[in-house]
Regions:
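Intrinsic, low-complexity N-terminal interaction/targeting segments
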Residues: 177-180
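N-terminal core-binding DNA-recognition domain of tyrosine recombinases/integrases
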Residues: 60-75, 84-174
Length: 180
């Protein structure tokens, strides 16, 4: 079975279609992931709402975006809101929860952000992001996980990607880096 993920715009939302096909190429299932982000003005302050495809505010995001990082620069808050939208889109695609993430899923998330294909069954997307953008997304995740007090989350572990690299990824670039 293969899984393909395609991205499309719906208004100002970025959505994903996840299609699973059998070995013969017949579609087994097709689902849409659309995590929406809205900004509203409340007493002269910008507040962010992040909600799922059922139009329910995603637990934890309101407090993080509107209280925890309230004193950050407006552009930083907006970037972090977009980062959380990407994170929850990925969570919907792989059908897991944030507190169940493994090192392998973190690596898949990095590839998802880059828009690159892996040797796994998830096809690539068309968006390519540079390393500074990826690092900003990962920093947002670490801060958000810390805010949520997720004890078993491997997001907070400070481990080299050489160690976290799962078997479906090539380790050659990292081996070359070590041997220099």
């Amino acid at each position: 079975m293969t899984t393909s993920v395609s991205e499309f715009k719906e208004g100002n939302a970025t959505c994903f279609v996840v299609e699973e096909k059998d070995e013969a190429g017949k579609t087994i299932s097709k689902r849409e992931i659309c995590i929406r982000l809205r900004s509203i003005q409340v007493q002269g302050q910008t507040r962010y709402l992040l909600y799922d495809e059922n139009m329910k505010v995603i637990p934890g995001t309101w407090g993080y975006l509107n209280d925890h990082i309230a004193l950050k620069a407006p552009n930083t808050r907006k970037q972090r809101a977009y980062s959380l939208r990407q994170l929850y889109s990925f969570i919907g695609i792989i059908r897991t929860s944030l507190d169940q993430f493994t090192a392998s899923e973190i690596m898949q998330y990095r590839q998802f952000l880059k828009g690159l294909n892996t040797k796994s069954s998830i096809d690539s997307r068309t968006i390519l992001r540079d390393n500074s953008t990826i690092n900003m997304h990962l920093e947002t995740m670490r801060d958000y996980v810390s805010y949520l007090h997720l004890e078993n989350s491997c997001f907070r572990e400070s481990v080299s990607s050489r160690i976290l690299l799962p078997s479906e990824y090539s380790a050659e670039p990292f081996e070359k880096e070590v041997s220099k």
